[in-house]
Amino acid sequence: EPANHTEEALQTFIENLRPIVKCAEQFGVIIAIEPVWKHIVCTVERARKVLDAIDSPNLQIIFDPVNLLCVDNIDRQDEIINQAFELLGDEIAVVHCKDYVVEGNELKSIAAGTGSLNYPLLLKKIKEHKPYVHCTLENTVPENAAATKEFMEKTYASV
């Protein structure tokens, strides 16, 4: 939705998020937002703007690199991953790990290690900047869980 990517939409999002973060501060909990290409917070830069505008340790980031990709920017995935750790690294609370393949004009989410995401780079950045961050496996089912776990462990050990 193009309207999601406007500055007006971002400012509306920030103003509506402020009271939610204040509530999180009062209860001593963390709230995390997940940048997604199709949503208002659709880039690493916009996520940084939200964090700076709210300025609270109780607001953090769920980083899902696949969700920041689209067919128009997949050739820049390394830049996006690097930028995420540069601009958001301290505030990344969780990393969602999945992969993607291109089907037509869309990205299809699949299990980590079975698609085109640069996992050596992602896991190297995690190891360097957030070695104890929680990572969740998405698009993993009983049939691929063991292989996905093995892929993640071997790749992490190799970087």
Q: What kind of region is each of these model predictions?
A:
Residues E1-I61:
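Active-site acidic/histidine proton-transfer and metal-coordination neighborhood
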Residues R18, V44-V159:
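Histidine-acidic metal/acid-base catalytic patches
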